[in-house]
Swiss-Prot record:
Expression across tissues: Root nodules.
Protein name, as recorded: Leghemoglobin alpha
Gene: LBA
GO BP field: nodulation
Lineage: Eukaryota, Viridiplantae, Streptophyta, Embryophyta, Tracheophyta
Originating species: Phaseolus vulgaris (Kidney bean)
Subunit structure: Monomer.
Domain of life: Eukaryota
Length: 146
């Protein structure tokens, strides 16, 4: 991977700001998208036991945390050229048995959600920046499995 640019980091940050503009709504978009593609993912998230509920603070907190991690991943890539995930993230994902196909479902849901959040500001360049940031975050989480 080439260097993550300042512009790419700014694009990721702008999508984060758009997401923060309506976290409950975009959390619903995100988790609904995940469950449409992988209904069994419901078992990985305790707060989805009763479906996607925008008033559930755990649902919105988890979405906000994940989207924030992608933003942080972009910042790490720009500053250091690599992403280091907290060992606890690796541990919980390992315990839950999260696999590559599930990381892909989350990535697709993240992109779909942020595309809706940014509206007509969506570009291929933004998509690429988000994909790089997410992919490097996912790789760092998987590396922390050990």
């Amino acid at each position: 991977m080439g260097a993550f640019t300042e512009k790419q980091e700014a694009l990721v940050n702008s999508s984060w700001e758009a997401f923060k503009g309506n976290i409950p709504q975009y959390s619903v978009v995100f988790y609904t998208s995940i469950l449409e593609k992988a209904p069994a993912a419901k078992n990985l998230f305790s707060f989805l036991a009763n479906g996607v509920d925008p008033t559930n603070p755990k649902l919105t907190a988890h979405a906000e945390s994940l989207f924030g991690l992608v933003r942080d991943s972009a910042a790490q890539l720009r500053a250091n050229g690599a992403v280091v995930a907290d060992a606890a993230l690796g541990s919980i994902h390992s315990q839950k048995g999260v696999n590559d196909s599930q990381f892909l479902v989350v990535k697709e849901a993240l992109l779909k959600t942020l595309k809706e959040a940014v509206g007509d500001k969506w570009t291929d360049e933004l998509s690429t920046a988000l994909e790089l940031a997410y992919d490097e975050l996912a790789a760092a989480i998987k590396k922390a499995y050990a």
